């Protein structure tokens, strides 16, 4: 994968998250902000989830209240390099915990 392909795929990830939150109808308020390639989700309780791209490694990094995760593209899925879980699984787990209600991005 070259750098432009990596950015195209990361942009698609960001767009999916942003579109899901734009149509979010849950009770919790979840704000989404994108600044310089970093996507920040802010929750009512003051906690945050930060998602950024590591261009030199062609990885997407996810920082949650619980832990940090690094994802490599395997086929068409971003997979955690430690646990083997998908990006969407770990993002939904963290967002659900931090929002206090079920959050889905798929």
From Swiss-Prot:
Domain of life: Bacteria
InterPro entries referenced in this protein's UniProt entry, alphabetically: CyaY, Frataxin/CyaY, Frataxin/CyaY_sf, Frataxin_CS
Keywords linked to the UniProt accession: Iron, Metal-binding
Biological process, per Gene Ontology: iron-sulfur cluster assembly
GO CC terms: cytosol
One of the record's GO molecular function terms: ferrous iron binding
Function of the protein: Involved in iron-sulfur (Fe-S) cluster assembly. May act as a regulator of Fe-S biogenesis.
Name under which the protein is recorded: Iron-sulfur cluster assembly protein CyaY
Species annotation: Salmonella paratyphi A (strain AKU_12601)
High-level lineage: Bacteria, Pseudomonadati, Pseudomonadota, Gammaproteobacteria, Enterobacterales
Gene behind the chain: cyaY
